[in-house]
Amino acid sequence: MTDGLITSAYLVSGVLFILSLGGLSRQETARRGNLYGILGMVIAILATLFSGKITNFQFLIPLMLVGGVVGAILAKKVEMTAMPELVAILHSFVGAAAVMVGIASYLEHHDHVGTTKIIHDIEVVLGVFIGGITFSGSVIAFGKLRGSISGKPMLLPGRHLLNLAMLLGSIWFGYSFINSTGDPALQALLVVTGISLVLGVHLIMAIGGADMPVVVSMLNSYSGWAAAAAGFMLQNDLLIITGALVGSSG
């Protein structure tokens, strides 16, 4: 497919996703909104597959089939009352994907120099940081909604200072990552990843189980911004648009 066709397909998908959000906002149009979302995703996947940038089909297709089958089984088995749990665990997948895309993007494009390197590294560290919080926070939210983790808030002494310390630590190591190359840069990025995972756990553990539906909405927003960051790293316009839609709607 030519770049023009791919861009057109992505634009159509973006419009369908917007229509999907509009349809899902009301019960009487929810079914139609869901269909819009399905159609938009099918177009996006096909456009990406035939973009000429995908080569390892022998690995990709089986993984897509496995994911599709697992998703269909979960959607069929999960009761509507347990839908927040399913949404929470799906958010964790988005966060994990953003972390892996960020690390892989750095390893593939570590030879950037100058302004290009700075911009790319900022995209990477933001994607990894937001993705890490989304992943670990969503796993905890899933556990609390399911009852596997106590719904009682875990209120550690000085928890706000601890959160601030982790945030400042992430900024420091992110700065070190941007201003380093090779193994030191990778080590700093992995430290940011670890801090974000711990921060996600600590943030959600401090919230009671009764407030988890609100937390899921917040994590929905986080997953959107993580996807948008991944879109910048992959230079994928549709991923940026979709991530921004999800992030703002969350």
Locations of the language-model features?
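N-terminal transmembrane signal-anchor/hairpin module of polytopic inner-membrane proteins
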Residues: 1-57
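Transmembrane alpha-helix boundary signature
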Residues: 48-61, 73-84, 99-115, 180-181
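Interhelical loops and loop-helix junctions of multi-pass membrane transporters/channels
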Residues: 80-136, 140-159
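Structural signature of hydrophobic alpha-helical transmembrane segments
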Residues: 1-14, 51-69, 120-135, 182-195
